[in-house]
Each structure stands twice: as C-alpha cells, then as structure tokens.
Amino acid sequence: MSLIIDSHAHVVVPPESYKFMAELAANRANPSLGVPKLSDETVRKAGQSIIDIMDKVGTDIQFLSPRPYMQMHSVKPGKVTALWTKHMNDLVYQTVQMFPTRFRAVAGLPQYRDTCPSNTLAELEFRVKEQGFIGCLLNPDPTEGDSLPPPGLGDPFWYPLYEKLCELDIPALIHSAGSCSPRESYTLKFINEESIAIISLLESEVFKRFPTLKLIVPH
C-alpha cells in the first residue's frame, strides 16, 4: 500500500510563540531572555489540529517546517532571526517527537539579509545530525525586498550551503519569506523568487559542481 506524503507543510504556531515573536520584534533581542520552551500540551494541541485535517483528506505523512513568511530574515539585528529560527525549529522538533508516525522535520535556516549563508550551517548540522531533520527551507532573498538582495541561487555566494546540503545528503525546499515591498505581497513573492531561482540555477554551473544537490521548488 502506497503512502500519501505532503512534502510541503508548516507548523501551527501557538499563541505563546506569537507572544515571543512580538517581544523579539519589540526589544530586538536586547536584552535577550533566551528561547522559551513550549509545554507538551501546547504542542500536542497544535499538532493534533494538523492531523485532524490530514485524516480528513487522506494524508499519511507531512514534512513540517516553520511558516516561511514569519521567518523574520530581514529584522535587525541578526540575533532576532537566530533566536526566532531556533524557537521555530524547536517547535517543529517537539511536534515530530510527539507524533513520530505522522510528521518529519524540515528546518528553517537563520538566514539574515545579505549575510553569507555559511552563518546557517551550525544550526542546520545540529538539527540534521542530532535531531534527525530531513531537509531545510532555503530563502533566495533574506532581505525580504527591503534592500538589494543576494545574488541568484546560481551564484557562488550560495556554495557553502550547497556543500553542506550535499555532505548531509538532504534536500532544500526553495521558499521565500516575507515581503517589505508595497507592490509585492508575500504570496506573490513566493512565486517570483522561485521563478528567479529556477532561471538562475539553469544558467549556472551549480549542478555540474554539485551533482548530488537536491532542491525542491514547491510553488
């Protein structure tokens, strides 16, 4: 019997996480109070709400990741992004641990504006090697339209991340985050950034240099 797997799904964010998000945005992680631990009851309620829908439509397994438009990749300073990413990855991990037969974990990366993606590798490696995550999200424009974006995904700028993805033998799901542009909603940016990413990759030598690289384009 074959399984129906949803490879592109996101966690339900509980009220406690929204509170933490508001505090981070307000105090800019200065001072930092660390990352809150969500109760099992909170995580169970959020996870069960997803499973109820999965059961209705006949989905066996979902690959869960943080909600992309809430990743705060452009919010200054970078510590805000780092703490929020950790909190969301913790939520993903807790949810998968609670419902191991229904979910698999996909990590968010602490990408920050136009910073080299090598700053994301420690978080990615920890989640994969220590917690069994099976992939990650990759945002082509962590500036979220607020300033000049990094080069396209075909550029060597991204090679440190591609090397790590190949080393860990996991795929990345290409997914932009929010949008600061008044002429481009975050949902429109999802489509635009993936279109740009595809052309940039096709016109590059990325897959010659990294023949085992696995990328997913979901929209």
Model-derived segments and spans:
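Helix-coil boundary/capping segments in enzymes
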Residues: 1-219
